[in-house]
Amino acid sequence: MTVTGPEADHAERFFAGLPGRVVFPVKASFSGTAVPVAGDVVPFVAGVSAASPGEEMLGLYDPLGRAVAFLANDGHRVEISRGPAADLAGFRGAAPVDAGPVSLARILSGAPGYAVAGAEAARYEDGAWWLSDGRQTLRSDPGRRFLAGAEYRVPGMRVTVDYPGRESADPPERIVLSVRGVTFTLRRDAE
């Protein structure tokens, strides 16, 4: 159900405040699996290092620690490069993505990837809020305490992100990302 007036304003302020909960620099490591549409489960490890939302690096590695791919985000464009183990993992490479001012570290920390402004709000039957501003659609938990999932629309693709089992506003322990037919399941390593 679409919401207007004070509830819509409250929903927008709630989602707009979530990126501020992520304190930079961000450093985190993950273990997980990638499942292509037609293929075997591929285990991997990953790490993110971000000095700021405009200076981020995400590395994907095989289970032996050999680099498969790197994503470098300058706050406007995500460059994707192959690592030495790319061929062994079946990664052929990808063109750069003009994603705009997105933050990969915020997404992996359980916050919206883009700043929130001027959006349409709605409420699900369970009480969760939904907010869409063109580039992203965000969904809260029913108690409206944290981000439960999101969909991002970047040129040439849609990226869906879910945080299954999330119970607090702390960085999520588990993240499921789907992009271009590949589902990545990440588990945040203990710090």
Task: Describe these PLM feature segments.
Residues 1-50, 54, 65, 191:
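N-terminal leader/targeting segments and the immediate start of mature chains
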Residues 31-37, 63-66, 81-85, 136, ...:
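Hydrophobic lipid-interacting interfaces of membrane-associated proteins
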Residues 51-52, 74, 125:
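Structural motif
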Residues 55-56, 76-79, 129, 145-147:
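Hydrophobic residues embedded in beta-strands of well-ordered beta-sheets
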Residues 60-64, 73-77, 82-84, 165, ...:
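A mature extracytoplasmic/lumenal domain signature
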Residues 67-73, 90-94, 159-161, 184-187:
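A short, polar/proline- and glycine-enriched secondary-structure boundary/capping micro-motif
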Residues 79-115:
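Acidic/charged, solvent-exposed loop-and-adjacent secondary-structure segments enriched in E/D, K/R, S/T
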Residues 118-191:
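Gly/Pro-enriched, hydrophobic low-complexity segments
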